[in-house]
C-alpha cells in the first residue's frame, strides 16, 4: 500500500464513519417493547389535548424569577414548575446579546415539572398546588454563595414548602419538599419529577450528527439514550435505586436527579406531540405532628463534565463519545490542560494534534517504511506473477517466501493506518461534543470553532495540504480508476469539509501539515538507506 492509497483508504473510512453515524441517527433499530406501569398515567400529571393547552395550563399561574450569576429560572407558582431557564454565561447565538434559553415555552414545550402525587397528593389531573411566595424576583446578591426560594401551600392542616436553592456558579438546582403535617391524619404522598419536550427530529446532519432526545441512568445501566422514537414505540418503565432521567441536545442537558438512596421508577410517555421522561419516588408517609423532607436535584445547563460528575453519578456520560470514549476522554482532558496553559481553544486543538501525531510517529514511520520496502519488491513480485500467473496457489506461496526472506510484512503499510482510525474518531467526537468550543474564537475571521468557516478558507487550505501530500508521496497505482479517485480526493474532501465545524477542519489541516513534515523526515531517512527515490 503506497501513501496515495493510504489517503484514499483514510478518506473512505472517514466518509463511511460519518455515513454510519448519520444512519444511526435516522434508522435506529426498533427496540423491544417494555412492560408499562399500570398506574403511571393515573398518578402523574400528563399532557393535555394540545400543545397550546399545555402552555396555557402551565403559565396561567403567577410566575416568579430566580437569578444567580449563571442561571435565571422562571417558575410558575401553580405547581412550582420551571418553565424557563436562561444560561447567562452562554449566548443564544454568536451575534446575540441574549442568553441561551434552554427550558422554554416559546415556540415549543420544554419544561421541568415536579410535585407530589399519590393518595394525598396535591398535584393531580384536576389541578396543581397554588403556591404562595413573598416576592416576584429573587437575585443572588454579592457575597452570597446561594439563594433559597421557598414556596408554600397549606391544605387540610398540612403545610407544604417547595424550595429551590441555586448556588453561585452552578447549574445544579436543589429542589426539596418540606411537609409539616399539623393534622390528625396520616398522609401519603409520592414525589415525581419529569421533563416535557415537544417531539422533534434530531437537528443533526452528515457533517455534525447530534442527538436530541431522552436518556437515563439506573443501577443496571450507567447511561443509555432513549430517543423520542423509542418513547413513541414503548414507554420506559424501570425500577432502580437512585438513577436519573435527562433530556439531551447538542452541548446542553436538563436532568432530574431523585434521592439516590431511594427506590425510584423511571418512566416515559408521549401524548399529543409532547414527550415526557421522568421519575417517581417511593411513597412517603407523614404521621400527624411530624415533618418530612423529600429532596431532588434539577440540572439545567451545559454539558460540563466536571460539574455534572459532581452533581450526579454518571451524569457526565451525557457527553457521549460513543465506543471510542476510552480514547476520547483522555484527549478531552488533554485539550483542557493545554487550553489552561495557552488560553486559546484553537491553539489548544493544534496542541492536541501535535501531541497525538508525535505519539503516533512510530506507527507512521513503520507504515512508510513498510510501504517503501513493498515498492522495492515490486520488480521481484512482478517476476513471480509472470512466472506463476496460471498457478495462483504456487504464486502465493512464493510471494510469502519472498516476504519472509526480505523481512517485509505485506500488511505493514495498512495496519498502522487502521490503528490510527480509532484515535481520529475519538478526536472527532471530542471536538464535536466539547461545549467549551461553542462560540470559542480562534483568530481573525474564526470567531466560533463549533461553526463552519464563514469564508471556507480552512477547508481550501486543508484541500491544498492534501494535494501537497499526494505530490510528495510515491505512487505505484496502475489502475486508472484508482488514479482518478485519488486525484480528485483533495477536491472531494474540500467540498465535504465546507460544512464541518472550523475546529474540526483546523485539526485536520494541522494534522496534514504535521504529516507533511514527518513524511519529509521519514523519506529523507529512507533515501539514506536506499529505500526511497525522491519524486521529480
From Swiss-Prot:
Record-annotated membrane-spanning stretches: 7-27, 332-352, 411-431, 449-469, 488-508
Main location: membrane
Record's subcellular location: Cell inner membrane
Recorded topology in the membrane: Multi-pass membrane protein
Database matches in InterPro entries: Membr_insert_YidC, Membr_insert_YidC_N, YidC/ALB3/OXA1/COX18, YidC/Oxa/ALB_C, YidC_ALB_C, YidC_periplasmic_sf
Gene Ontology cellular component annotations, sorted alphabetically: plasma membrane
Swiss-Prot/TrEMBL keywords: Cell inner membrane, Cell membrane, Chaperone, Membrane, Protein transport, Transmembrane, Transmembrane helix, Transport
Gene3D superfamilies in the cross-refs: 2.70.98.90
Biological processes, Gene Ontology terms: protein insertion into membrane; protein transport
Gene Ontology terms, MF aspect: membrane insertase activity
A Pfam family this chain is assigned to: 60KD_IMP
Oligomeric form and interacting partners: Interacts with the Sec translocase complex via SecD. Specifically interacts with transmembrane segments of nascent integral membrane proteins during membrane integration.
Protein family: Belongs to the OXA1/ALB3/YidC family. Type 1 subfamily.
PANTHER family: CYTOCHROME C OXIDASE ASSEMBLY PROTEIN COX18, MITOCHONDRIAL (PTHR12428:SF65), OXA1 (PTHR12428)
Function of the molecule: Required for the insertion and/or proper folding and/or complex formation of integral membrane proteins into the membrane. Involved in integration of membrane proteins that insert both dependently and independently of the Sec translocase complex, as well as at least some lipoproteins. Aids folding of multispanning membrane proteins.
UniProt protein name: Membrane protein insertase YidC
